[in-house]
Design a protein with these regions (language model features):
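Outer-membrane beta-barrel "beta-signal"
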Residues: 53-55, 143-155
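Extracellular/periplasmic helix-loop-helix junctions in multi-pass membrane proteins
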Residues: 136, 140-142
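Short acidic-hydrophobic sequence patches enriched in Asp/Glu that either
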Residues: 9, 47, 143, 147
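Extracellular beta-solenoid/beta-roll
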Residues: 8-11, 23
Length: 155
């Protein structure tokens, strides 16, 4: 059984592109791939992919502020031959295991909107919204909506 004490040897590759279309718009993307081989506590391999596309709007409404729209896929198991399926035992025991052997049956889509509002040169507040469609990589899961607010102090 794969648990929190299991060890994996992982090879990972990723790429990022960022294009400043104008002083007020940047377009970017990133993607990644991992292949993990179980070495202690289990046997088998797991492959995952992830990606994101985004638009940033520097100086939106005021110099120093930033708006952002991000759309992507969190890490998704695309292939697995682990003996217990495609998720660790702590997720299996919680009832989140995939019913499809070898890969997760659907893709989670992450949509994020945020706005960095600079209050002073050293303090900013960032409200945001995150939507997770098909969470846990299953099409039967309800959409999750998360509201966020972050305060940043710069020294």
């Amino acid at each position: 059984v794969i648990g929190l004490g299991s060890s994996f040897l992982t090879d990972a590759i990723g790429a990022t592109l960022n294009w400043r279309i104008s002083p007020y718009v940047t377009l970017g993307t990133w993607g990644g791939y991992t292949k993990s081989n179980a070495v202690i506590g289990a046997s088998g391999t797991v492959e995952t992919t992830n990606w994101m596309v985004y638009l940033n709007f520097p100086d939106l409404f005021k110099q120093g502020n930033l708006g952002g729209i991000y759309i992507g896929q969190p890490p998704k198991i695309t292939s697995s031959n682990l003996s217990i399926g495609n998720v660790p035992s702590f997720l299996n025991s919680a009832g989140f295991a995939s019913e499809v052997a070898g890969a997760q049956p659907a893709s989670t889509t992450h949509v994020e909107l945020f706005y960095v509002h600079r209050l002073t040169d050293r303090i900013s507040i960032t409200p945001g919204l995150i939507f997770l469609f098909n969470p846990l990589q299953t099409s039967t899961s309800d959409t999750v909506t998360i509201g966020t607010i972050r305060t940043t102090f710069s020294f």
